[in-house]
């Protein structure tokens, strides 16, 4: 059985949520209203708590001292409720992704180069999380890693500084690199790969 057979279950979606959320790129439209309401309550309690904690202990009133403990307990309870609501939401999303009828809704976007068409997926939670998990699966399975131009330049500068020889640097680019990849051969290879799960193949 493929190691990615369970890649669209709750745990995988939760990992995807944490990865995106840590970067501050988690959009509200992909989360449930109930979860968002609890998260807002938590932020308000955190704001009130910080307002009290900024005061020195000697300057706090008895009411404020009591409020600190109260807020901490309420925030702890709220965090548990958030976790439950998020689990319920992601479990439902997972079930819809794993259904046989689920597909990405691709919409063509305007492109400056007709040879480089652009497409966007639908704005649903199912499509967002499915794409996150699919991309992660492909990166892990095929060890896909794209270095940024800044990282490449830094490495190049380091190498040139270590060697005092004279060099000429020529910058080149492959025209329409990704567009030139024969898709029929690529999909044939993916279809025959036993490590890639059936769901990922169907989404591709």
Set out the residue ranges of the language-model regions.
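Short alpha-helical scaffolding segments that buttress acidic/His motifs in well-ordered protein cores
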Residues: 202-204
């Amino acid at each position: 059985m493929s190691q990615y057979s369970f890649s669209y279950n709750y745990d995988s979606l939760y990992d995807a949520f944490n990865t995106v959320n840590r970067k501050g790129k988690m959009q509200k439209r992909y989360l449930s209203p109930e979860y968002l309401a609890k998260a807002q309550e938590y932020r308000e309690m955190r704001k009130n708590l910080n307002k009290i904690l900024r005061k020195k202990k000697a300057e706090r009133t008895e009411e404020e001292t009591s409020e600190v403990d109260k807020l901490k307990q309420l925030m702890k309870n709220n965090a548990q409720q958030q976790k439950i609501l998020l689990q319920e939401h992601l479990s439902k999303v997972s079930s819809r992704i794993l259904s046989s009828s689920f597909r990405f809704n691709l919409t063509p976007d305007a492109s400056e180069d007709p040879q480089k068409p652009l497409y966007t997926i639908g704005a649903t939670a199912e499509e967002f999380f499915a794409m996150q998990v699919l991309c992660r699966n492909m990166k892990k399975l095929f060890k896909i890693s794209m270095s940024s131009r800044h990282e490449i330049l830094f490495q190049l500068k380091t190498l040139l500084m270590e060697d005092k020889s004279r060099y000429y640097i020529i910058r080149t680019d492959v025209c329409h690199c990704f567009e030139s990849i024969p898709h029929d051969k690529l999909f044939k290879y993916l279809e025959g790969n036993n490590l890639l799960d059936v769901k990922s193949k169907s989404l591709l």
